[in-house]
């Protein structure tokens, strides 16, 4: 296929641990450009379907995804298969709370995790604005939901995540480099916090992704590798995305300590995610 159609992209939907689906070496690979990361999709959805009180015991599901992430060139995938046949829509899968507001907060965190995690992205139509009903082949999407600020906010978040993804190399150039991804402070006592760094190809190209998957606000000191400041690019709890934080709170510059090991302190609202850009 590559020889006769050099501009075509081939993607394998393969659910086992069969090796070398995308390996570039001739003769060692099936020759696909990408492979669906079904393991990641399964583990992540299972985590977000877990009630908040039980999430600390399940956080290892997200951490474990790192173990196989760089064995292939993956695409993180949320396809139509996950929103049909009584599996519920993405927003209705969220177990953060019973109200739509809380489910939307949980879904916003999921979106930041999807865009922040190494690998390409797919999101089936309707998920980007929080369609409530399952996908039905004979029905239109629930576009009327966009009259609500909750669904407008979800759509705006996806729009902003896409903008960061296509304009900032940190989150798309180093997908296959294990050394460009690093978890931070996995010894969190609460079991509800997760953070990781994404590095670009150039010195100083660093983003920090921080998550609070719990039902209460937390303040956390994260160790970081560089001295300097970090600007919050996205806070999923912003009113812009249907949350409750004012814009000033979402555009603060967080300073690091003056000596190594450097650290920054973040206030993390319940069911929230933040993206911070390192500033020299």
Set out the residue ranges of the language-model regions:
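Conserved alpha/beta catalytic core and glycan-binding cleft of carbohydrate-active enzymes
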Residues: 1-136, 166, 172, 176, ...
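A short acidic, glycine-rich active-site loop
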Residues: 97-101, 145-152
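A generic helix-loop boundary/linker signal
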Residues: 104, 151, 220, 261-262
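Generic recognition of stable, solvent-exposed alpha-helical segments in well-folded globular domains
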Residues: 105-109, 149-157
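C-terminal accessory region downstream of the catalytic core in glycan-modifying enzymes
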Residues: 146, 153-154, 161-163, 222-255
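Beta-rich accessory regions
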Residues: 148-153, 162, 166-172, 275-280
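C-terminal beta-strand-rich structural cap/linker in extracellular carbohydrate-active enzymes
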Residues: 247-280
């Amino acid at each position: 296929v590559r020889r006769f159609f050099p501009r075509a992209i081939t993607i394998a939907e393969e659910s086992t641990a069969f090796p070398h689906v995308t390996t570039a070496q001739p003769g060692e690979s099936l020759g696909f450009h990408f492979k669906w990361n079904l393991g990641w999709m399964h583990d992540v959805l299972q985590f977000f379907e877990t009630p908040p009180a039980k999430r600390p015991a399940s956080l290892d599901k997200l951490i474990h995804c790192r173990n196989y992430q760089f064995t292939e060139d993956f695409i993180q995938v949320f396809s139509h298969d996950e929103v049909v046949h009584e599996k519920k829509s993405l927003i209705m899968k969220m177990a953060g709370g019973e109200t739509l507001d809380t489910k939307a907060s949980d879904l916003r965190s999921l979106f930041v995790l999807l865009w922040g995690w190494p690998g390409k992205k797919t999101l089936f139509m309707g998920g980007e604005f929080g369609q409530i009903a399952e996908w039905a082949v004979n029905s239109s999407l629930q576009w009327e939901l966009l009259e609500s600020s909750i669904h407008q906010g979800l759509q705006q978040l996806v729009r902003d995540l896409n903008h960061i993804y296509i304009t900032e190399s940190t989150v798309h150039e180093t997908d296959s480099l294990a050394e460009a991804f690093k978890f931070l402070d996995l010894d969190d006592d609460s079991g509800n916090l997760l953070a990781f760094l994404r590095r670009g190809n150039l010195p100083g190209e660093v983003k920090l992704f921080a998550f609070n998957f719990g039902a209460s606000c937390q303040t956390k000191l994260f160790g970081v590798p560089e001295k300097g400041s970090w600007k919050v690019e996205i806070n999923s709890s912003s009113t812009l995305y249907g949350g409750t934080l004012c814009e000033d709170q979402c555009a603060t510059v967080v300073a690091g300590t003056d000596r190594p090991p450097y650290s920054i302190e973040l206030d993390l609202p319940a069911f929230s995610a933040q993206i911070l850009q390192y500033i020299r």
